[in-house]
Structures are given as structure tokens and as C-alpha cells.
């Protein structure tokens, strides 16, 4: 499977523990393409349809013509076997906003 950074896939995030986002849902790939080529895992941020405009850990987007949020506070590594079909891709502008948000939250 050829997975690219900023592609959006459906992924099966079950089983989950506690407050982890679960179910089959869209996820955005945030790991570097070189990692995606050679590893059997990818780093993702799950998407949710529950919109929290005041949460600084979330980025609002449109995905498959629906409002969604990228849950940067729920970054995790998953097996590529959890990925289903590719459904969308972040725009360059949203990818830049996502990189900035990740840096602001976890950087330096």
C-alpha cells in the first residue's frame, strides 16, 4: 500500500482504551513519506465530526463534503493493516496549518 503524508483514509481504530478516539473513521496521515514507504506503521491524527471551535488542539476541515476536526491531541501510531480506503487529501493550506499546530503543541 502506497501511503502519502496528508492523505485521508478510513481506519479501524478499535479496540480503544479510555478516552481514545475509536471506531472506523477518517484519519490523516502525518508521518513522513520516507517512513511511510519503509515501515509497516503510520502516524495519524483521527478526524471527528464533533466540532469544538475553541479547542486549540483541533483543526477544522471539510472532508468528503462534511465538517470535521483533526484531533491533534489524539496523535498515534497505527499499523497499515488498520487502513481501509483512501477518501481525501488535505489541501496545501490545511497541511501547513496542521504542521504549525503540531509544532505549537509538541515542538521544541
List each model region and its residues.
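Conserved functional hotspots at enzyme active or ligand-binding sites that engage polyanionic ligands
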Residues: 1-108
Amino acid at each position: 500500500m502506497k501511503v502519502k503524508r496528508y492523505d485521508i483514509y478510513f481506519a479501524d481504530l478499535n479496540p480503544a482504551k479510555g478516552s481514545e478516539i475509536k471506531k472506523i473513521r477518517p484519519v490523516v496521515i502525518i508521518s513522513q513519506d520516507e517512513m511511510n514507504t519503509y515501515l509497516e506503521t503510520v502516524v495519524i491524527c483521527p478526524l471527528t465530526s464533533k466540532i469544538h471551535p475553541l479547542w486549540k488542539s483541533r483543526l477544522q476541515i471539510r472532508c468528503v463534503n462534511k465538517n470535521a476536526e483533526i484531533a491533534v491531541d489524539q496523535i498515534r501510531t497505527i499499523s497499515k493493516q488498520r487502513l481501509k480506503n483512501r477518501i481525501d487529501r488535505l489541501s496545501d493550506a490545511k497541511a501547513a496549518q496542521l504542521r504549525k499546530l503540531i509544532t505549537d503543541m509538541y515542538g521544541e
